[in-house]
From Swiss-Prot:
Organism of origin: Oryza sativa subsp. japonica (Rice)
Pfam families the record matches: Glutaredoxin (PF00462)
Name of the gene encoding the protein in the UniProt record: GRXS6
Domain Glutaredoxin: 31-131
Protein name: Monothiol glutaredoxin-S6
GO biological process annotation, one example: cellular response to oxidative stress
Record GO cellular component, one term: cytoplasm
Amino acid sequence: MAAARAAVPIAVFLLLVLAEADPAAATRSPSAFVQNAIYSNRITIFSKTYCPYSMRAKRIFRDLKENPYIVELDLREDGREIQSVLLDLVGRHTVPQVFVNGQHVGGSDDTANAHSNGQLQKLLGNSQSQR
């Protein structure tokens, strides 16, 4: 009987360890994907291919000769889940959502305003800041 009681905590411990043993599962989560996309890339744009506002944000970076990491949510099976993560993270469910050096810039209008007032260039670290 004592051996059986001792085996229960060991079995519980092993279940907990094995449940956490798959780090790949954590990186497959939409939340982990979003965090990795934001912090592993200088510029990240969460976009949809058909969205004119997303096209505008991408055009701004193209005009600046920048090459952002673009996540096209409508082309991903987990696009809706990623959009829900963005809602939790920045309080917006719309696209585009633009991040520069880990900092949330905002949507299309926010990005255009940051570009026109020089804030975007400052975030990018470009010396050609417009004033």
